[in-house]
């Protein structure tokens, strides 16, 4: 099984958690694109979706899935999204695609967070993948200095503007032993919109594509 085939298996496995007549929270990324393809097969049985990015919105609309603004929706039963890293406690690093803030907002609304990944994303300790931090542009240098104080090496992601008009700092060389505490600490830096640690709101269900099929874990 190739990596993409494992992603596809995980994406399609999430379809069984979609309820008839519901609005589905949909994330962003290569694994989520497989879920969107799967979701399109039952588009007539759901009300539609809420999207975490312009890219996912465009893909769903092209496939005929109705997309709602989150402000129109008071509840979501599930949010389906991928991760750049996930540990045994279902804490995650997300934001490689720069959609972390909207992803975190939609995840906060949903009753259940279903994380879909291939087995290369599972780690013992978070931090090998650089931690994305979304920053108000004028605060970039200040936030970078504060992140250095935390032991990280922040790098400005050149040429990337988020859907919210902000910039991304990717923080390297963090060994994240307490994800919840670090998520809170970084978010308290003035000028930070949010960071890519999803620990205070981690995943509830993990669907991991492996060479032996999709493995399911619950939190």
Curated annotation (Swiss-Prot):
Keyword presence, Isomerase: yes
Q: What is its EC number?
A: 5.3.1.6
Domain of life per record: Bacteria
Q: List the keywords (alphabetical).
A: Isomerase
Residues binding substrate: 28-31, 81-84, 94-97, 121
Q: Mind telling me which Gene3D superfamilies this protein's record contains?
A: 3.30.70.260, 3.40.50.1360
Which Pfam families is this protein grouped with? Answer: Rib_5-P_isom_A (PF06026)
What subunit structure does UniProt give?
Homodimer.
State its role: Catalyzes the reversible conversion of ribose-5-phosphate to ribulose 5-phosphate.
State what protein this is by name: Ribose-5-phosphate isomerase A
Give the source lineage, highest ranks first. Answer: Bacteria, Pseudomonadati, Pseudomonadota, Gammaproteobacteria, Alteromonadales
């Amino acid at each position: 099984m190739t990596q993409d085939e494992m992603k596809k298996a995980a994406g399609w496995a999430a379809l069984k958690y979609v309820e008839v007549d519901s609005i589905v929270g949909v994330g962003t990324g290569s694994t989520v694109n497989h879920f969107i393809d799967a979701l399109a097969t039952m588009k007539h049985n759901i009300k539609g979706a809420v999207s975490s990015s312009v890219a996912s919105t465009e893909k769903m609309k092209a496939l005929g899935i109705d997309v709602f603004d989150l402000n129109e929706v008071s509840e979501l039963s599930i949010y389906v999204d991928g991760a750049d890293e996930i540990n045994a406690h279902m804490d995650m690093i997300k934001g490689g695609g720069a959609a972390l803030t909207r992803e975190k907002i939609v995840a906060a609304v949903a009753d259940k967070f279903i994380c879909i990944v291939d087995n290369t994303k599972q780690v013992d300790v978070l931090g090998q993948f650089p931690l994305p931090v979304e920053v108000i542009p004028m605060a970039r240098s200040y936030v970078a200095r504060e992140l250095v104080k935390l032991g990280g090496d922040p790098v400005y992601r050149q040429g990337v503007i988020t859907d919210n008009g902000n910039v991304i700092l990717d923080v390297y060389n963090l060994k994240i032993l307490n994800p919840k505490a670090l998520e809170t600490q970084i978010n308290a830096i003035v000028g930070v919109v949010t960071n890519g640690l999803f620990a205070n709101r981690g995943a509830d269900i993990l669907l991991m594509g492996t060479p032996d099929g999709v493995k399911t874990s619950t939190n």
